[in-house]
Amino acid sequence: MKRLIPFCLALVMALTCLVAVPAQGADLASVQGTVQALGIMTGDENGNMNLTASINRAEFAKMLVMASPYKDSVASGASNYSLFSDVRRGHWATEYIRVAVEQGWVTGYSDGTFRPDQTIKLEEAAASLLRLLGYENSDLVGSYPAAQINKFHALGLGDGITVTQGQLLTRGDCMYIFYNLMTAETKSGSVYATT
């Protein structure tokens, strides 16, 4: 019996890392543990999450795919096929970009580029996440980017972040955003993590 109690306590503590609650009431360790356990974000070779570093379009595309039901559809290794002139064959994110574009979560630019190394702003991330949740521009009130940012916050996706329109996202911001995504409401009314 004495061995059973510590085991049960350890099990309960481990499972709480996997239960997503809005980031507003969650501590950093729970948020980080959840996004890492789900494979949405990983640290560098030393395990450092580099939470103050900015995020680029390629990294964000990977996070979108890893947070989606399509995460297993990404071929292992880099692809020899690229949709964009500036995403070279063999680029580490080629497959993630392909899936994110095919699903309509992100788009390229009219000049045929994706700009994978370009940092991403809040409004760009908000638009992509809303599309991931099934929302279309016609479901929103107002115009870009205010409509997207308003819906993003109304769904609780921005809990735990301080950036505003026009500002670049950090890895720390993305960690909270993707944590919040798990409990966000989809267009169909279900909780995202259950879809």
Segments from the language model and where they lie:
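Feature responds to low-complexity, polar/acidic, surface-exposed segments characteristic
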Residues: 2-31, 36-61, 65-94, 102-168, ...
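Extracellular, beta-strand-rich glycan-interacting domains
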Residues: 178-180
